[in-house]
Amino acid sequence: LMLERGAFDGTHMAMMVHPAPQECDHFPTLAISQCDFHYHGRTAHASVTPHLGVNAADAITVAQVGLGLLRQHLNSDDQVHGIVTKGGEAANIIPGEASARYFYRSTDLHSLSVLEPKVKACFEAGAIATGAILDVQPLGPPYSEFIHDHDLIGKYRQNAESLGRVFSPPSTKVAGSTDMANVSL
């Protein structure tokens, strides 16, 4: 939000400090997109008039099955994870509304742009299979992978070590994402 509103305009250097269980001078991150997926179906009584319903929760089930099947075709660094945020009100009512929130991550913005349509296609399949209407709401802009300034990292580390800080070996695992990465572009 600060970046989008110009808070970093004219800034030549920005630094993020993040709590961690050990000292580290930088951490690699993944690019990320985040979306809410809403299905609009038609509520009906599950026993009396099920044929009149359009089950929005079933649409999420189809999407989740699709995502599960998609995983074997993803790059090893791609991640897709999420939750159902709304799935119905009662067992005897076919839910007319259902929602899920999903995050998908990849090594960089380009790889993320390849992953994103595959994820969205799984949710579109849920709509096609059930007749529900899909509404996709991005939760903000995609966040980039972090672009590190290794000269700045070296100076930070040298100064911190002169103050007695002891650093852990650098992590080779790329995990997590941050909006600060967009400042690093």
PLM regions and their residue ranges:
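Metal-dependent amide/peptide-bond hydrolase catalytic core
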Residues: 61-185
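Histidine/acidic-residue-rich, glycine-tolerant segments that coordinate divalent metal ions
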Residues: 1-95, 105, 178
